[in-house]
Amino acid sequence: MARSLKKNPFVVHHLVRKIDKLNKKKKKGIIKTWSRASTIIPTMIGHTIAVYKGKEHLPIYITDYMTGHKLGEFAPTLYFLRGHPTERPTKNDNRSQR
């Protein structure tokens, strides 16, 4: 379900403050955050934000096409392995030999 247009997009306040400080200084740096639920707003464009994905921070460079999306969409937390291993260990089941 989409967020109501009456409300502003959700962004954690400390993240907005850090971005505003860097914009005033006209510097680009990596900003670490644990807030995967924050929405990408236009003031974030051009910055690199390291989003926590459960074990480590994944640096993401923000472009204009990402506005309106959540930070967590660009940092996957699960990696699926394909199928089963090629060689399965054999079972030594003595009951079948009786």
From Swiss-Prot:
NAD keyword on record: no
Keywords noted in UniProt: Chloroplast, Plastid, Ribonucleoprotein, Ribosomal protein, RNA-binding, rRNA-binding
Annotated localization: Plastid, Chloroplast
One Pfam family from the record: Ribosomal_S19
InterPro entries: Ribosomal_uS19, Ribosomal_uS19_bac-type, Ribosomal_uS19_SF
GO biological process: ribosomal small subunit assembly; translation
Keyword Plastid: yes
MF annotations from Gene Ontology: rRNA binding; structural constituent of ribosome
Gene Ontology cellular component terms for the protein in this record: chloroplast; mitochondrial small ribosomal subunit
Recorded family membership: Belongs to the universal ribosomal protein uS19 family.
Role played: Protein S19 forms a complex with S13 that binds strongly to the 16S ribosomal RNA.
Stated name of the protein: Small ribosomal subunit protein uS19c
Annotated organism of origin: Jasminum nudiflorum (Winter jasmine)
